[in-house]
């Protein structure tokens, strides 16, 4: 199975198909899901009970301690440490504040849920009948199983396995976070990205200015290789260009733009 497959690769937080632990053949179903999960992870567990626990939601467990909650607790810290070490080594020019913002974006529930669904872990979950009957459950459920699986990998295979897998799975999320959450100099980041990925240099255009001379507001827009991006307002042209660059970076990564272009701030 291709580890990049997903029920919907464009939205990792869509409704997910769940495995009902109360089906007529729950054991056989769970075994099939465990095997599929190992294929996704590219790793054969020595302790299959550990992996089953990682995939089991509290609603599908015989008792609370048989669910993935304890593994989720450990996986959260393993994920955080691994990403922190990665960022610390890869981005020596970034400040503590920038690294913190990047890390927070990478390990967020949304990011983890999206990656888990791209991998196909949403097809490996084991839950109770009530969850599947209601068809209503928190979207954080998939990010929880992602953290639990990380913990299971850590226990069964060690930190190297976790480090290798996370660098493969989270590379896109790290690049996105670096480009949108990192250095406050968005113009510099946009220029580096545009030259590296698009072989082009951004240009900025004044679209509109408003207000009295002592309190003017400027609307600037960024353009890269003839593609125009959402403009942004600023108290001066330099500030507006920085914000326009931030909007461009967000659009280039299919993310929500951080600055409004409809009207100048009050």
Curated annotation (Swiss-Prot):
Keyword Nuclease: yes
Alphabetized InterPro entries for the sequence: dsRBD_dom, RNase_III, RNase_III_dom, RNase_III_sf
Species annotation: Rhodopirellula baltica (strain DSM 10527 / NCIMB 13988 / SH1)
UniProt function note: Digests double-stranded RNA. Involved in the processing of primary rRNA transcript to yield the immediate precursors to the large and small rRNAs (23S and 16S). Processes some mRNAs, and tRNAs when they are encoded in the rRNA operon. Processes pre-crRNA and tracrRNA of type II CRISPR loci if present in the organism.
GO MF annotation, one: metal ion binding
An example Gene Ontology biological process: mRNA processing
Name used for this protein in its record: Ribonuclease 3
Location of this chain's protein in the cell: Cytoplasm
Family to which this protein belongs: Belongs to the ribonuclease III family.
Cystine pairings recorded for this chain: none
Enzyme Commission no: 3.1.26.3
A Pfam family hit: dsrm
